[in-house]
């Protein structure tokens, strides 16, 4: 049968974000409302082939990077868009009651495993380090400031993960199943806090 573009085992493996079937999805809860899976019945022969010798249900380094990139892009750009369109005004984060509501919705959407106090601390860090625009009025100047903040957030998350991963595994090549990305807890919570803004103001 046709092999399509005939990708290598490593390339295919890197693209399987949720390496299990729908029937196996309950064994891999992500705390979200819908079940996540990538392996359909027609895919199973190729999936079993590409996972030969791999740890069960594990993702290779390349797939972990893709997964993190997706989380960072989604969290940062959804907040950017919500500010640009007027759906979210960061000034509301100064209201403790509003923060409580956002955190409640975040945990309802992404799961109670996300500690409320740590989510609050993440919001406070991001505000304290001026990673939300103080005033946004749609002007060219404020749009430029928003773009700069977006870039700062992406750089912040990527730098923290790269640093933590290199501190753990050293400077050599990091490929396939030789290593895992290391995401600091504070970074994880900041990403989920941004996702929570999208849940509360956009979803």
What spans do the regions from the language model cover?
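C-terminal subdomains that position terminal phosphate/3'-OH groups for nucleotidyl transfer/ligation
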Residues: 107, 111-203
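Sequence-structural signature of the catalytic-core scaffold of metal-dependent phosphohydrolases
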Residues: 1-143, 154
